[in-house]
Amino acid sequence: MFRDAWAQELWGARREVRVVREPASVELELDRALAIADELYAALAEVSPLVGWKLGATDPRTQASFGTDRPFTAPIYGDGIIANGDAISLSRFVAPRLEAEIGLRVHVDGIQLVPCVEIVDCRFPGWKLTLPGAIADFGLQGAFIFGQGMAGDPAEVSEIEVTVKRDGIEMQRGSANPADAVARLRYLSHELHQDGHSSHLVATGSLISPISLDSGHWVADFGEFGSLSLRVVN
């Protein structure tokens, strides 16, 4: 099915919800990782529609650990979207972590701020991977929740805060200027115009450190901009 054996292995790991059986991702070169990702996304596109894009490694610390000075990008497909308030099983993921993000809805009339929760996942054992590994491994995607678009001009909002709770207990809180999220669209300037879609959802990077996802009722409260929730079951 795939030209590259790594693509076949990652596809199988995703389908079977397991870690890869190959050597560490350090053996992957960037050009090969990009080619693997192209193969995998082409296969996903045959069964699920493109709905948006994600930006990964948006903070300086993660970029430094990956040896890069810019985020990586990855397409989001419809099978990765879950509805606000839905239940989701841990059996769907290998090593999931939760992130709360400023999402964007980019359309012909402008840009809307959108609350976003991303469940990141990794098919390399112990999350030990390099930048090429992250790119090849579906951009570390697990699932996404996007809320309703926030009314008003994003330029008029100076800060968005989020508090993440599990079963009513605060796990983390964070904040960011949405102007920084909008500015990151420059890394998607080609992608947002090449596929003919009139609207895209964009996950722009986490406001918090990734939290290991356990069973329970999770809420990401973005204050006046609304909240997102999900029930995680075993």
Regions found by a protein language model. Give the residues of each.
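Conserved metal-binding segment of the jelly-roll/cupin
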Residues: 196-211
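Catalytic-core "active-site belt" of small-molecule-metabolizing enzymes
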Residues: 2-193, 214-215, 219, 225-234
